[in-house]
Amino acid sequence: MATYFVGDLQGCYDELQLLLERVDFNPTQDKLYLVGDLVARGDKSLECLRFVKSLGNAAQTVLGNHDLHLIATALDIKKVKPRDRVDAIFNAPDFDEQIHWLRHQPLLVHSEELNFLMSHAGISPDWDLKTAKSCAAEVEQILQHGDFHYLIENMYSEQPDRWSPDLQGLARHRYIINAFTRMRFCYLDHRFDFACKSPLKDAPAELTPWFNLDNPLYKQIPIVFGHWASLVDEPTPKGIYALDTGCVWNNRMTMLRWEDKQFFTQSAVKNYSDF
């Protein structure tokens, strides 16, 4: 039995299958964890959704920002982004089933047995483990069982950009969603910056990656995340695993076998910018 993590798919189905073949993935014995953004700019988003869903308990994903945007478009809250290739999802006979399944995926996965935390973008520098788990559960409860339409309709905001336990209502839920699905750089006072998406060497001096801020949790439990393709080949602190290596940007897809921390990579098999 082996445990695998894989970076953002973004509709890059062929590369995922090549990686699974390479490691001889067996869904009756092995487990696949995905860091979110199953869909978007690649040409096989529907295949990615169907495949991960078909694995049942052999796979677990978390919600990424592109996954949430797909749900928003399915609810007629947002329009499909011009670069997203998701028409096949909207035309599929199992469209409602796929969106329902996606909406019921978590923002955070914590395994005590395997000793890891996984989310799409990371863990807020102001949260301990208890806070991270309770915040994720708050929003998951609404997405799965509450007024999810109202939440998704009102989640698009960059404020508040700093955590406070006194945050309530939509402000609180926006921060939680942004922390788990959009966070990259922060100011030293832990405020989020959503404008900068550049490689670390090109970032303004006042900004630092969230994982370089002082949070004891970052050293207590290994954290697996995706979302940040420009981190490719950048060193990260011990126990911080950045798995988005920009396959949809014509780079590569990365898989991590947890038991021995061995990485496997698959170069993009097509030029996605040509579509």
From Swiss-Prot:
It catalyses: P(1),P(4)-bis(5'-adenosyl) tetraphosphate + H2O = 2 ADP + 2 H(+). InterPro entries: ApaH (IPR004617), Calcineurin-like_PHP_ApaH (IPR004843), Metallo-depent_PP-like (IPR029052). It holds the Pfam family Metallophos. Its EC number is 3.6.1.41. SUPFAM superfamilies: Metallo-dependent phosphatases. Signal peptide: none annotated. Keywords: Hydrolase. GO terms for molecular function: bis(5'-nucleosyl)-tetraphosphatase (symmetrical) activity. Hydrolyzes diadenosine 5',5'''-P1,P4-tetraphosphate to yield ADP. This is Bis(5'-nucleosyl)-tetraphosphatase, symmetrical. It comes from Haemophilus influenzae (strain PittEE).
